Amino acid sequence: MDDELVKAHPAFTRHFSAPIYEDPANELAPFGSDEGWDLLFTVAQRCEELTDTATLDDVLALADVPVADEWGENPEGEQWYEDATFVAAAGFTLLRLTGQIDPAGHQRTLQAVNILIDYFGEHPDLLQQRADLHSWPTESTRQG
């Protein structure tokens, strides 16, 4: 498999400029884990199915990833971590491919990154992702 990531939407490139967003080997980077890498490439192959109003749920459906709509209160084993890994990857995939994210998807992606921070600790790469998601404009779900 090629080590190059799928070309990013200009809005993604402008906002998510830290090296982790182009790092295919860092397990804590959005596309560095096997799950993140596979999800990005699976969805990129069907990119024409993503409209300007595509949602996080659309990305999860295209990738055929079965995650719960809610986090629930009592995770079983590592279920929260596994779901959070897929949700974070899906959120960043949507942003990378379309330059936008739906408000509900934005919140779920932030929640997923927070779960990963709880699981792995306050690693700088995860803190960077959270900060970048927090600063993503929410008035409009699309940047230029």
What are these model-predicted stretches?
Residues V113-G144:
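Eukaryote-biased recognition of C-terminal alpha-helical segments
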Residues D57-Y81:
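Acidic, Ser/Thr- and Gly/Pro-rich intrinsically disordered linkers and low-complexity segments
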Residues V6, P30-S33, E49, T53, ...:
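Alpha-solenoid helical-repeat scaffolds
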Residues L39-C47, V65, R96, Q107:
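Catalytic toxin/effector domains delivered as secreted proteins or via bacterial secretion systems
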Residues R46-T53, L62, T98, G144:
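Short loop/turn hinge sites at secondary-structure boundaries
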Residues G72-E76, Y81, A90-G121:
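Long protein-protein interaction modules used by eukaryotic assembly/scaffold proteins
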Residues D2-D57:
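Short terminal alpha-helical segments
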Residues P24, Y81-L97, R130-H134:
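Amphipathic alpha-helical elements of HEAT/ARM-like alpha-solenoid repeat scaffolds that form extended
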